[in-house]
């Protein structure tokens, strides 16, 4: 599972979405290996609290049982983000 937390006021979130989340390699890898969940921290207060989200963007990778594997904070370039995904998924 991949959880992406964003805020409508977050410049880094907008950059991440415009650059990284439009990259076909990133999208293909996420769609192939993860269930995708997006959290709007301005609107979804319960989920924001449950996932302990303090900054945006936050990217959280969970195993099938819901245990956190990795948490990334802030903007990542396409290649850096793919490198992080590939460390999790072989």
Where are the model-predicted features located?
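Short active-site neighborhood of thiol/selenol oxidoreductases, capturing the structured segment around
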Residues: 1-10
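Hydrophobic beta-strand anchors of alpha/beta hydrolase catalytic cores
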Residues: 1-2, 36, 59
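Solvent-exposed coil/turn segments that connect beta secondary-structure elements
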Residues: 7-8, 41-42, 64-65
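Typically the conserved alpha-helix immediately C-terminal to a functionally engaged Cys/Sec
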Residues: 12-29
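Non-catalytic, surface beta->alpha helical segment in thiol-disulfide oxidoreductase systems
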Residues: 19-21, 54-90
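Structural microenvironment flanking redox-active thiols in thiol-disulfide oxidoreductases
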Residues: 19-20, 41-48
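Structured helix-beta-strand junction loops
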Residues: 32-33
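Electron-transfer interface patches adjacent to heme c in soluble/periplasmic c-type cytochromes
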Residues: 39, 51-52
């Amino acid at each position: 599972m991949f959880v992406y937390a964003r805020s409508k006021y977050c410049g880094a979130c907008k950059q991440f979405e415009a650059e990284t989340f439009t990259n076909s390699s990133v999208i293909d890898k996420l769609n192939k290996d993860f269930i995708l969940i997006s959290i709007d921290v301005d609107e979804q207060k319960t989920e924001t609290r449950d996932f302990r989200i303090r900054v945006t963007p936050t990217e959280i990778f969970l195993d099938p049982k819901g245990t956190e594997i990795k948490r990334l904070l802030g903007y990542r370039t396409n290649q850096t983000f793919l490198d992080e995904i590939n460390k999790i998924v072989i």
